[in-house]
Regions:
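Oxidoreductase and adenylate-handling cofactor-binding alpha/beta cores
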Residues: 45-56, 108, 190-191, 247-250
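Mid-domain beta-loop-alpha active-site segment that forms a flexible
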Residues: 32-53, 97-99, 177-184, 230, ...
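Dinucleotide-binding Rossmann-like beta1-alpha1 core, especially the glycine-rich loop
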Residues: 1-20, 145-146, 166-167, 176, ...
Length: 277
């Protein structure tokens, strides 16, 4: 299916996989998929680049304001009221991430999005030795999967998916995370043993019942558009969804957009488990 959509991905047996990542533990290694065109991006730098370009195109940013209410009249959006003022607009996009449900309720509606805590960490910089991101989708004690990669600065960035999920807004680091992820990482790449960890942190994923985003118009309030529940894939999905939302809000949908919106409809029947990891 991935190849049918143009993705360059292939299965490599253990011997060929070790040619790509020589430092993998060979004992018990069967193989894995490899996508040479994959990469990573700095969320901070990417966000700032989008911010600067948006300003060049005339976008106005208001930082440090909390939306208290989505204003409506006659079943249609009129704008938003914040703790610092009122802004009138014919359309409001709910893209509030883990706070999506809170904002939806400020509009008198609801969305099935809950915040899910995930922890990550970063090491000291070391000489370059790792090219692709390593993703281990095998479940382990306390975790569903984990990944790590080497940043261009030489630091190793790593994250784990807790199992069961930790629902809530607690962003405090835990004492369980580092020992758990270290055991798993060293199990497949012993070379990491002596690298020092600089810091860990905890953030929130906005999760939906089936692990796919909720994108489309709100039926209960005309002019309210939903772009919520990216489930940890927001940075990857953002550019494409941003263009789709622009076309949706301005009534300029292209062929194929309606099929995408149907698949991501906030009103779809939720079945199965999370598909995106």
């Amino acid at each position: 299916m991935q190849k049918a959509h143009g993705l360059d991905i292939r299965w490599l047996g253990a011997k060929d996989l070790l040619k790509v990542v020589p430092d993998l533990e060979p004992d018990g290694l069967i193989g894995g998929t490899f996508s040479p065109g994959d990469g990573s991006v700095s969320p901070m730098l990417a966000t700032h680049a989008h911010y600067r370009q948006a300003k060049r195109l005339g976008a106005l940013f208001q930082f440090g304001e909390k939306v208290l209410q989505v204003l409506a009249e006659g079943g249609r959006v009129r704008g938003v009221r914040t703790d610092k003022g009122t802004y009138l607009a014919p359309a409001v996009v709910n893209a509030a991430g883990p706070q999506a449900r809170e904002l939806a309720r400020a509009a008198g509606t609801d969305v099935p999005v809950v915040p899910d805590s995930h922890e990550a960490g970063v090491t000291e910089p070391v000489a370059r030795f790792l090219e692709p991101m390593i993703v281990d989708i095998r479940p382990g004690e306390g975790s569903a999967n984990y990944y790590f990669y080497q940043h261009r600065t030489g630091q190793i960035i790593f994250c784990i998916t807790p199992s069961p999920a930790i629902v809530g807004t607690d962003r405090r680091e835990t004492s369980e995370f580092l020992p758990m992820v270290s055991r798993r990482m060293l199990g497949i790449m012993p070379k990491l043993r002596n690298i020092k960890v600089r810091r860990t942190w905890r953030g929130l994923y906005p999760m939906t019942p089936d692990g796919s985003p909720l994108v489309g118009r709100c039926r209960e309030l005309e002019g309210l558009v939903l772009a919520v529940g990216m489930c940890g894939q927001g940075l990857m999905l953002g550019p494409g969804l941003g263009k789709l939302l622009c076309r949706l809000v301005t009534d300029r949908l292209e062929p194929g957009d309606r099929e995408t919106l149907e698949q991501l409809s906030p009103y779809r029947a939720f079945a199965g488990v999370e598909r995106l990891k």
